[in-house]
């Protein structure tokens, strides 16, 4: 516990919050260009081939982003929109690609949770 005299001399340091998505630079989304599209394997108890892309952002960062949904049309030089949000079983993946925007197509034949995958309403 500091004395009052010590507090007068130097005030208490404010706690600084560390952002979970620094590459977005306090923006909700960021545009970027895919430099590499590949698959990655998840951490220990899980097993799959998760689709990820290496993206160079307009903020100058190069990050790894997850491609959600079944099937995608991304390739090198595709322009994508990124949002924050990590993938728990892929270390180092802290961003998601937004489906249905820019060069990213929405998920085909998606009926539930369509807005999250950029899918249009089905023709009834």
From Swiss-Prot:
Q: Which GO terms describe its molecular function?
A: rRNA binding; structural constituent of ribosome; tRNA binding
| GO-annotated biological processes | translation
> In terms of domain of life, where is this protein from?
Bacteria
Q: Protein transport: is it a keyword of this entry?
A: no
Carrying 3-methylthioaspartic acid, the residues are: 89
Gene Ontology cellular-component terms for this entry are: small ribosomal subunit
Entries under Gene3D superfamilies matching the protein: Nucleic acid-binding proteins (2.40.50.140)
Q: Which UniProt keywords apply?
A: Methylation, Ribonucleoprotein, Ribosomal protein, RNA-binding, rRNA-binding, tRNA-binding
Which InterPro entries is this protein grouped with? NA-bd_OB-fold, Ribosomal_uS12, Ribosomal_uS12_bac
Does GTP-binding appear among the keywords? Answer: no
Q: How does this protein assemble? A: Part of the 30S ribosomal subunit. Contacts proteins S8 and S17. May interact with IF1 in the 30S initiation complex.
Q: What does this protein do?
A: With S4 and S5 plays an important role in translational accuracy. Interacts with and stabilizes bases of the 16S rRNA that are involved in tRNA selection in the A site and with the mRNA backbone. Located at the interface of the 30S and 50S subunits, it traverses the body of the 30S subunit contacting proteins on the other side and probably holding the rRNA structure together. The combined cluster of proteins S8, S12 and S17 appears to hold together the shoulder and platform of the 30S subunit.
Family that this chain belongs to: Belongs to the universal ribosomal protein uS12 family.
Write down the NCBIfam families for this protein, in alphabetical order: rpsL_bact
Q: What is this protein called?
A: Small ribosomal subunit protein uS12
Query: Which species is this UniProt entry from?
Result: Prochlorococcus marinus (strain SARG / CCMP1375 / SS120)
């Amino acid at each position: 516990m500091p004395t009052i005299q010590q507090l007068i001399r130097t005030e208490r340091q404010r706690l600084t919050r560390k952002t979970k998505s620094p590459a977005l630079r306090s923006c909700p989304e960021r545009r970027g260009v895919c430099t590499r599209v590949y698959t990655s394997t998840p951490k220990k108890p899980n097993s799959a081939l998760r689709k990820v892309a290496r993206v160079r952002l307009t903020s100058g960062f190069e990050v790894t982003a997850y491609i959600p949904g079944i099937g995608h049309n991304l390739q090198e030089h595709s322009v994508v929109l990124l949002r924050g949000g990590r993938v728990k079983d892929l270390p180092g993946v802290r961003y998601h690609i937004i489906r249905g925007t820019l060069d990213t197509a929405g998920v085909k034949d998606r009926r539930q949770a369509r807005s999250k995958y950029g899918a249009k309403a089905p023709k009834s």
